[in-house]
């Protein structure tokens, strides 16, 4: 048997003894999980042998991979090959984090490093954007949005709100997913949210647009970042300098709501409804 589970009745260790050290996991893997790992091992090859594309199709048009997107992929390649299992990527808003990660997930699958992927977000609008991007960029990979009340499906890519996964993560074994992507991860590594993330024994990739100096240490600790430094960072000043973003200008003003207030017609406030309507 290529895998060993060790337990003292409280902790469970998973040991892929031919490739890695034993590590703590939250639950035993299923037979299907282990069969998938054996299959992936037979297909595995170095990420360096999987070319990073110069161009890709997005919404029917050919786009050129930007230098910093290529740099992020190369940084991930190096850390994956070194055996690191958690990664933090910092890219400013508007610099194509979703495109980058979808293209990188494709390379992980091609290298035999992943078959099942979980893409977590914390807002409905972000989930909508993620599933649209994944289905556009990865049309050959089955995917779906796991919403409350929807039965779990056996597809390659699962997009889900973290708020939903908190109540459903125990439906999955710890070995069910090979990669867990968390968008805007600096907001999502506290309390029960971190419990849901930590349940999965997977490669964890955190995405954030927040500059490193404003990220709390909890995020760096979760993603095993050395010296509180992301695995790859592209500062917004560089994006301005290189012409990938337009410099912003501050505009000040006072809205009628701020100056005059508002009358509340109903006492009931539904945060979920507010989220759907305004985000």
Model-found features: residue ranges?
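Short glycine-/polar-rich loops that comprise or flank the Walker A/P-loop
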Residues: 1-2, 113-115, 141, 177, ...
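ATP-dependent helicase/translocase motor core
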Residues: 1-116, 125, 129-140, 154-157, ...
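Conserved structural-core and active-site-/substrate-pathway-adjacent residues in large, well-folded domains
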Residues: 8, 69, 94, 123, ...
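Conserved nucleotide-binding/hydrolysis micro-motifs of P-loop NTPases
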Residues: 10-13, 124-126, 163-166, 186-187, ...
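Conserved SAM-binding loop
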Residues: 65, 119, 182
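Conserved helicase motor
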Residues: 121-125, 144-152, 161-167
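SF2 helicase catalytic motif II
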Residues: 172-206, 211
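Interdomain helical connector at the RecA1-RecA2 junction of SF1/SF2 helicase-like NTPases
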Residues: 217-279
């Amino acid at each position: 048997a290529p895998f060993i589970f060790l337990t003292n009745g409280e902790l469970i260790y998973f040991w892929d003894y031919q490739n890695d050290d034993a590590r703590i996991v939250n639950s035993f893997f299923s037979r299907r999980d282990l069969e998938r790992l054996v299959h992936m091992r037979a297909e595995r090859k170095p990420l360096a042998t999987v070319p990073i594309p110069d161009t890709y199709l997005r919404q029917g048009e050919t786009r050129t991979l930007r230098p910093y997107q290529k740099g992020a992929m190369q940084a991930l390649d190096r850390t994956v090959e070194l055996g690191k299992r958690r990664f933090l990527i910092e890219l400013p808003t508007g610099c194509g984090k979703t495109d980058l990660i979808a293209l990188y997930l494709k390379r992980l699958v091609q290298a035999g490093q992943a078959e099942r992927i979980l893409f977590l977000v914390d807002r409905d609008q972000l989930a909508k954007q993620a599933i649209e991007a994944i289905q556009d960029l990865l049309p050959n990979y089955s995917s779906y949005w796991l919403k409350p009340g929807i039965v779990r499906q056996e597809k390659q890519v699962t997009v889900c709100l973290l708020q939903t996964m908190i109540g459903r993560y125990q439906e999955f074994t710890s070995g069910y997913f090979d990669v867990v992507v968390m968008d805007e991860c600096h907001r999502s590594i506290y309390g029960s949210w971190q419990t849901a993330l930590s349940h999965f024994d997977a490669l964890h990739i955190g995405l954030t647009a927040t500059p490193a100096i404003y990220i709390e240490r909890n995020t760096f600790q979760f993603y095993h970042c050395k010296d509180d430094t992301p695995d790859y960072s592209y500062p917004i000043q560089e994006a301005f300098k290189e012409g990938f973003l337009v410099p912003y200008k501050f505009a000040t003003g006072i809205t009628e709501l701020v100056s005059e207030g508002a009358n509340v017609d109903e006492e009931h406030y539904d945060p979920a409804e507010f989220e759907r309507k305004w985000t």
